[in-house]
Amino acid sequence: NQIKKSNTSTGARIPKAMTNPADNFAGGQWKPPGRRSARTSATGMFVCEHCLRAFTTNTGRGLHIKRAHEEQANEAITTERSRARWTNEEMEAVQAEIDCEGRTAINQEILRIIPYQRTIDAIKCLRKQQKYKTIRERVANRRAENRARETELTRLETADEDPASQEQDNPNMSLKNWLKEVIESDDDRLCADLRTAIEMALAGQSPLDVCTVGCYQYTMTNLPLVPVRLGGPIYWCNAQSRSNPGETQRRQTIKESNNSWKKNMSKAAHIVLDGDTDACPAGLEGTEASGAIMRAGCPTTRHLRSRMQGEIKNLWRPISNDEIKEVEACKRTAAGPDGMTTTAWNSIDECIKSLFNMIMYHGQCPRRYLDSRTVLIPKEPGTMDPACFRPLSIASVALRHFHRILANRIGEHGLLDTRQRAFIVADGVAENTSLLSAMIKEARMKIKGLYIAILDVKKAFDSVEHRSILDALRRKKLPLEMRNYIMWVYRNSKTRLEVVKTKGRWIRPARGVRQGDPLSPLLFNCVMDAVLRRLPENTGFLMGAEKIGALVFADDLVLLAETREGLQASLSRIEAGLQEQGLEMMPRKCHTLALVPSGKEKKIKVETHKPFTVGNQEITQLGHADQWKYLGVVYNSYGPIQVKINIAGDLQRVTAAPLKPQQRMAILGMFLIPRFIHKLVLGRTSNADVRKGDKIIRKTVRGWLRLPHDTPIGYFHAPIKEGGLGIPAFESRIPELLKSRIEALGASNMQTARSLLGGDWVAERKKWINTQKIKNSEWAQKLHLTTDGKDLRDTRKAEASYSWIRDIHVAIPASVWIKYHHTRINALPTLMRMSRGRRTNGNALCRAGCGLPETLYHVVQQCPRTHGGRVLRHDKIAEQVAIFMQEKGWLVLREAHIRTSVGLRKPDIIARKGQDCKIIDCQIVTTGNDIRIQHERKIQYYASNWELRRSAATMIGHQGQVSVEAITISWKGVWEPRSYCLLRDCGIPKVKIKGLTTRVLLGAYLNFNTFSKATYRTERRRTAN
């Protein structure tokens, strides 16, 4: 039997005669081919021992095993060494473990620490090497620096400041002086209640009374409040609507879905895409279990009186107006239990400063500001497990505003460990994921050992001890007044748990930070800094000149080491550090990955038979093909996996939901596509996959908007300002976002992140970016170069030309909104449109007998059948403009007939307001010529006639100059910029100008509809040029 070679000449399939197991028996015994089997005597082929596939070369067989049998290929790698080799991490660990000062028998001590595959002679040779001496000096210098730092910190914490310096630098003195200046200034903007409170404060009365009189009474009595509603899931239809049959049920369902959309667009979109993830059994079980976690803790430290040296005292300086305006309360944030809205709070700008400074002077705030409601957001539907809830505390708007100012002040001093990349002004997600990807790639390329531990901390934000927060603030040298205030807030705060419209009872948390409070992320980072200090400095993965021992993003910890012993030491240290802060790891949710080099074979093996331990519990060890997620990016042992854009199912759910096309487009652009952006940018993908995803989206949108199949591709992806639909294209968006995030690494304050720019990982990503076939900015040009899209090239010049497209609140009926798009992109079925690609002479002439090609422009703007519609459209626009101007106080004269020496002139509008008088004429023009030229021609038509201007002034009762203006709009709703500016200068709001645009488009579609239904044919026949 002869074997036919494959096209690649690297492999062939064994004929059936060869794959018969009996062929491998010799003398009654089975003889399987070896891992490096030689050529078979009969065929001269190399056979795979796993699937019996034959190859012409041994290299081809090896590549086949590596790709088709990954697990078997990984297990076949041998990592055992004939003799031990010393790594830099191991030498630093040994030197850090022993104390060389005044000790003897150091060689025996080293042998005791690392007994495996080591001898006394080997240790002696190692200690004579210059590399070991350099490491010994570096370890000694690091130990000396740490000792000096700890000594200084202990001295600052135990030593009190000199009383004279305390009095001179006391932050409260500057606050007291500021309050005196406010009282003496007689500022009218200061209300009586607040003035009384400041006077009481300066008189030394009770802080609680001062805060109650000055802060709470003023804000509660003088600001409008809103009732606080319990949050809950949104349902598309209730039980009653399900019982209604047929058309009634459909209408009721659509009505309720539209109401849900208006109440909470984001939640309604998530229900469409994910189902009702907020739904869970009603009752107080979830609130009681979560409340038990918050109440379990040690008593909070009481008021501190001793000040430590080196405090950053300017953190407690008086608050300025610039700071208040810089972090003004967001208008979209929810109100707290007191019902105060952000709009009301931001309206008392000068009083806010006085309130905040008085709070700082006393170190306390009104107790009602401390009350919050904690909404438990379930991570999984139907759960009652406390670990599966995400608590979000919503306190008073005033307290959140004040704490945001304090958080900004602390953040400006750079007090946090640079390894912590969460809640800072940096792209921490991109930095950490890129570093992890780069380290895995370097370990495989350079055959280096890499051990990774992905840790999960149990309810980290809810479990941190309050005493740990206080210790962390002391280490960061925050002033005594700020520390006392923060601890007073945590000692006196109350909250009420809410889950799915169910209220729990008021509780006083004894542990955890207040998630939702602007200060909480910074406080948690300070606590995590204490945990990171426990990591051994000699352990980590050496990448270039930097050693990376951990990647940290809030409570997401990834530990790295070059040796197994190094990673186990880091795990033990981190476990001890977390326990000191009242935190604990969840071993069942932790994972480790061991990439072990094989020096002889020049390969990397994923080991799984030697697990790591945390708290005497083994951690799950990831295998060769196992996957895990870190910061939203899915990894395996080779790095980020290839991301598939599985968007078809989500699009089908959006299509099946009872939504209007405007709502579907909003969900697509605002919620669905952004779900894929993160993992596509930071993960891996291919050009073929992103183009396939774009094709699926375009196909679905064509169905939603009933667009023909040959609609220009640029119309889907061009920005709305350029006349398109503004749908982000994966093909162009992903490479540009990846490029911008890579460039941002160069501005990072972390040296290891900046060093990535010269590495292999970034070079590989840049190489893929350069394969980009179209840029994001080229979609507009792609649209404007087509026959259907060239008329939209001036859209960006006036906001009214495109503002109607994003109609997320469904102000325009759905069927009409679709027809507007058909009109703009020439999608209405004219003969010229329908005969594309199969047109012959004469078969596309106008059905009205005009003798001209039946284009959409001809039907709407030229054909005699639609003349009456064009007149009505023009008159309606002029009428609406006149009404809008009258509403703004203009005296308007409509369609005045003025006879001049050159003939009768009938300007649409003559308007006067004060000393301003205008002659305005409206026109709806074609876009074939420059719309600017047509606009100037219309103005010149009236401006050159001095008799017209004089008669118009006389008719309207004006004595001064008369200006001539024109309102020029194309029949596709594109405005001439000066026309738009004219109406805005006249005081007409944008929303009404947008209505003029849609009225023009509606008139164009009605003209086409009239043309299609009419049977009138003109007697005068013309032939096309």
Swiss-Prot record:
Compositionally skewed regions (Basic and acidic residues) per UniProt: 146-158
Residue ranges, annotated region (Disordered): 1-38, 146-172
Cross-referenced InterPro entries: DNA/RNA_pol_sf, Rev_trsase/Diguanyl_cyclase, RT_dom, Znf_C2H2_type
Matching Pfam families: RVT_1 (PF00078)
Region annotation (Nucleic acid-binding endonuclease) ranges: 755-1025
Source organism, top-level taxon: Eukaryota
Residue spans crossing the bilayer: none
The Reverse transcriptase domain, residue ranges: 358-635
PANTHER family: REVERSE TRANSCRIPTASES
UniProt-recorded name of the protein: Retrovirus-related Pol polyprotein from type-1 retrotransposable element R2
Organism: Nasonia vitripennis
